[in-house]
Amino acid sequence: MDTKAQDALVIIELYKLRCEPLMRTARAWFVSEFTPQSGRQIVELMLSGQEESAYYRMVASYWETTASLVNNGGVDEQLFLEANSEHLVVFAKLQPFIDEIRQTIGEADYLAHLERLVLKVPNVEKKLENRRSLLKSWSRASRGENQLAVGSGQ
């Protein structure tokens, strides 16, 4: 089997992991219910022992591990980036707080693999801003608030 085919199989296996029931629950929570206001709030959640702490850590560590595989050549970068975009959503939500989290926990490299991978994406700042807008919309929808139609320009 050639390298591209092997990489494709790894990407499919990574996708299957995302479909595990608990991971699906964690991902849904992260996208629609997790609305951090500060890095300190995220650190407090991580240390809380609450169910949501496990959800956060599952999502963050999944994407950090996956990004490490890509960054270190375990999976073809172009193939991965063309097949995935959820890592952009995760990073878009966490990016405003990354520096504060790193300072608070004393780990300068917290989520560094994810950050490095995301920052390689062409037009990344525009894409991250778009993801943040979508996240706000999805969060409002999960709370039952009125939402603007995606793509309405409002």
Regions found by a protein language model. Give the residues of each.
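Acidic, Ser/Pro/Thr-rich low-complexity regulatory regions
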Residues: 1-153
